[in-house]
Amino acid sequence: MTAISLGMPDVPTRLAERRKSRQIQVGPVAVGGDAPVSVQSMTTTRTSDIGATLQQIAELTASGCQIVRVACPTQDDADALPVIARKSQIPVIADIHFQPKYVFAAIEAGCAAVRVNPGNIKQFDDKVKEIAKAAKDHGTPIRIGVNAGSLDRRLLQKYGRATPEALAESALWEASLFEEHDFRDIKISVKHNDPVVMVEAYRQLAAQCDYPLHLGVTEAGPAFQGTIKSAVAFGALLSQGIGDTIRVSLSAPPVEEIKVGIQILESLNLRQRGLEIVSCPSCGRAQVDVYKLAEEVTAGLEGMEVPLRVAVMGCVVNGPGEAREADLGVASGNGKGQIFVKGEVIKTVPESKIVETLIDEAMKIAEQMEKDGVTSGEPSVSVAG
């Protein structure tokens, strides 16, 4: 009887049907409709420093970022946009606050899209007609980016604070102004630093419009805290089919935002998984140093892009079962390790040879996958108990 690997299902299970939304184009990247959920980030450089900004965009691109946003608070930043938009490997979105003149500058510069904050752009409502015409003439989508920290004063007076209702109403009101001028090439975000408020705001928004939605928890915090907040909020929404593009906001290097974003999508089967290391958290039953073993295997397989699940287990309780369900695995104990490939034990090796053997077998499987034309995903590492 042929063993079947349960590690990487060919047809991943989805938690809910995707919300039906209109599709827009942010450069070559489709957002909304049936397009895959994309991952984006924002540069931390001064946009006027063209070299540093393009270098950071290159690093983000290499990490899997699909869309990048750049700040544009000054005229020097606006002057840099044409070069950055032209030389960037991925679509560039200009992030505009306060000054409407920079919206027009970004459109003229050839940015793939422009984010506007209706809560703090001077006389924004009066400028919508001009912005809509310029954007339409250039084929430039507009992201209406509502943020709890800069909500329109009229809505703060009405609701008293940035409630889910206030955030959704602000976005829909501004979208309606663009619609009056026959402009619907729009995506929307309603960000809050509280995941519960943010989730409810997006739920309300999703029920009232068909625009693609950009998910984000604003000011999420340092890497650990921000990762938890974003994972909780995005998981709640994406599992209900809500969300078309995501940005994980972290007080950390932008590349870390991409790593977290990709992991979230992989965890929800919204993206092809890459390398996945499944390792037990260790306990008193463990007969090997699981931490060290997992770290060494991870380091040895760094950069592998085929969808391969490798189980590194430290005892006989869950070890054999987890190892059998992975594409490749080891169940350790009594100074040795049983090596499993596709559910079958292929050999038993001394503890000192476990890492070397796992890496060798992983390379063989990866080589065969590549010959078979298996689509590669983004490398990832996860820990399971």
From Swiss-Prot:
| GO process annotations (BP) | isopentenyl diphosphate biosynthetic process, methylerythritol 4-phosphate pathway; terpenoid biosynthetic process
What top-tier enzyme class does this entry carry?
Answer: oxidoreductase
Which spans are transmembrane here? Answer: none
Q: Which InterPro entries match?
A: Dihydropteroate_synth-like_sf, IspG_bac, IspG_bac-typ, NO2/SO3_Rdtase_4Fe4S_sf
Q: Cite the binding residues for [4Fe-4S] cluster.
A: C280, C283, C315, E322
Its keywords, alphabetically, are:
4Fe-4S, Iron, Iron-sulfur, Isoprene biosynthesis, Metal-binding, Oxidoreductase
The pathway where this protein functions is: Isoprenoid biosynthesis; isopentenyl diphosphate biosynthesis via DXP pathway; isopentenyl diphosphate from 1-deoxy-D-xylulose 5-phosphate: step 5/6
Q: Which reaction does it catalyse?
A: (2E)-4-hydroxy-3-methylbut-2-enyl diphosphate + oxidized [flavodoxin] + H2O + 2 H(+) = 2-C-methyl-D-erythritol 2,4-cyclic diphosphate + reduced [flavodoxin]
Q: Which cofactor does it need?
A: [4Fe-4S] cluster
- E.C. no: 1.17.7.3
**Disulphide connectivity of cysteines:** none
GO molecular function, a single term: iron ion binding
Record carries keyword 4Fe-4S:
yes
Task: Give any Pfam family that matches.
Answer: GcpE
Q: Does the keyword Iron-sulfur apply?
A: yes
What does this protein's record comment on cofactor binding?
Binds 1 [4Fe-4S] cluster.
Q: What family name appears in the similarity comment?
A: Belongs to the IspG family.
**Protein task:** Converts 2C-methyl-D-erythritol 2,4-cyclodiphosphate (ME-2,4cPP) into 1-hydroxy-2-methyl-2-(E)-butenyl 4-diphosphate.
- The protein depicted here goes by the name 4-hydroxy-3-methylbut-2-en-1-yl diphosphate synthase (flavodoxin) 2
Q: Which gene encodes it?
A: ispG2
